Amino acid sequence: MLEQMGKQAKDAAFILAQLTTAEKNCALSIIAEQLEQQAPLILAENAKDIELAKQNGLSDALIDRLLLTQERLQGIANDVRHVISLADPVGKIIDGGTLDSGLKIERVRTPLGVIGTIYEARPNVTIDVASLCLKTGNAVILRGGKETQFSNKILIEVVQNALEQAGLPKFAVQAITDPNRELVMQLLKLDRYVDMIIPRGGAGLHELCKQHSTIPVIVGGVGVCHIFVEKSADQNKAVFVIDNAKTQRPSTCNTLETLLVQHSIAEEFLPKLVSHLSAKNVKYHAKSTALNILKQAGANVCEVTEKELRKEWGSLDLNVVVVEDIHAAIEHIRQYGTQHSESILTSSQNLARQFINQVDAAAVYVNASTRFTDGGQFGLGAEVAVSTQKLHARGPMGLEALTSYKWVCEGEYTVRK
């Protein structure tokens, strides 16, 4: 089954690589239109997944990731249209010149080929990845979690029908619909056809891919994100940033998980934060100084464990740690962070610069919420993933991250001396 799927994807990628930007944009436009026109059917299938998720006792955070609404579906269609508006990187000349030999060389962006994406309860990823791959001339094999079986099946049907309407091979976008986990292992070994694996999910999925794949894997997505409130921060504005970073959409990987507060302002600042978040049902996890202050402020708080400081909650749980200064904050991030997104709230330009220079993360913020680490927010279009590794791509992966390059060399029957 996967051998055939891989061959079909490879053949489709050969065709996609030759398409003009206009031809690719036409297909994307039809996909966006079909998402809107088929919205009632898509939402009905998604409702089946939601009902099964509830019956199986899945967490609220997981159900939120799984849920499609009319608003979210429209947002997905809009993201596809935004991808249309973006410059096509394929064929772009990165650099080049003429050598002493007279040989003219250029480094030109090309599609990667076939992308394999393994993800969990995120039906939006189906369209995000498909649209970015199509724009960059890549074929894709998708494997969503069993929680999204109904949603993914209808979304793939919509995309494949749109591709056929555009005169393109429907096998450019394929999905493994069988929930058998052994098929994931087979996909990870399909290096004859697949050029890159992108996992979208928790730490367990990323570890599985790293350990078993014979194909290059993009590592990332797990976000234990921190915000450090330095003593010179505007406290009244800081509570709004923390509110946004923690409560806007707790299930995302760019959500705040651990708040670091400088010791000298902790007794003043933390009660303000508790008051501000009083209606948001935030549960705090803290120790020593922070635990005592939060208890006195009437917060719903318990003692934090070492394991929880490394945990991506994906919920309204928030770790709070009081640190002595910026050095202690940076050291905490070095020890517990996942190199995803880290932020400092401060009025000091010098300390902001120190934080930027010393914190090793895909995205580093000054006086802003970590929630901006997103392809759409960064102007990249719908992202395919957030990479926390350092080779090939880092941070939100947009179009250019789905390309490679080739050296194009032109001569006049030139020979090497």
Swiss-Prot record:
Pfam families reported in the protein's UniProt record: Aldedh
GO CC list: cytoplasm
Statement: the UniProt record of this protein carries the keyword Oxidoreductase: yes
Biological process terms in GO annotation: L-proline biosynthetic process
EC number: 1.2.1.41
Domain of life of the source: Bacteria
Record's keyword terms, sorted: Amino-acid biosynthesis, Cytoplasm, NADP, Oxidoreductase, Proline biosynthesis
Enzyme class, spelled out: oxidoreductase
Example of a GO MF term: glutamate-5-semialdehyde dehydrogenase activity
Major localisation: cytoplasm
Record pathway: Amino-acid biosynthesis; L-proline biosynthesis; L-glutamate 5-semialdehyde from L-glutamate: step 2/2
UniProt subcellular location: Cytoplasm
Claim: Glycoprotein is one of the keywords in the record: no
Catalysed reactions, as listed in the record: L-glutamate 5-semialdehyde + phosphate + NADP(+) = L-glutamyl 5-phosphate + NADPH + H(+)
Function in brief: Catalyzes the NADPH-dependent reduction of L-glutamate 5-phosphate into L-glutamate 5-semialdehyde and phosphate. The product spontaneously undergoes cyclization to form 1-pyrroline-5-carboxylate.
PANTHER family tied to this protein: DELTA-1-PYRROLINE-5-CARBOXYLATE SYNTHASE, GLUTAMATE SEMIALDEHYDE DEHYDROGENASE
NCBIfam families registered for this protein in UniProt: PRK00197.1, proA
Family the UniProt entry places it in: Belongs to the gamma-glutamyl phosphate reductase family.
Record protein name field: Gamma-glutamyl phosphate reductase
Organism field: Haemophilus influenzae (strain PittGG)
